[in-house]
Amino acid sequence: MARSLKKGPFIAHHLLKKVELLNTSGKTEVIKTWSRASTILPMMVGHTIAVHNGRQHLPVFITDQMVGHKLGEFAPTRTFKGHTKSDKKARR
């Protein structure tokens, strides 16, 4: 179920402060965050945000096509190593 329009998009306060600070100063630096549930807003376009995937921070460059999506969508948490060649059950 989608979030109510009355509430507006969710974004962590600390992340919003950091983005606003970078926008006013004009600096370009990587913002580290653990907030995968934060929605990407138009003010974030052009910034690089390092999103935590449970093990490390993956840098994500924000483009205008990403607006409205969540940060966690662009930092995968699981890596598939592949099935072993002799595993008969996985090959069925």
Curated annotation (Swiss-Prot):
Protein name per Swiss-Prot or TrEMBL: Small ribosomal subunit protein uS19c
PANTHER family, per the entry: RIBOSOMAL PROTEIN S19P FAMILY MEMBER, SMALL RIBOSOMAL SUBUNIT PROTEIN US19M
UniProt function note: Protein S19 forms a complex with S13 that binds strongly to the 16S ribosomal RNA.
Transmembrane intervals: none
Major place of residence: plastid
Pfam families with a match to the protein in the record: Ribosomal_S19
Location(s) in or outside the cell: Plastid, Cyanelle
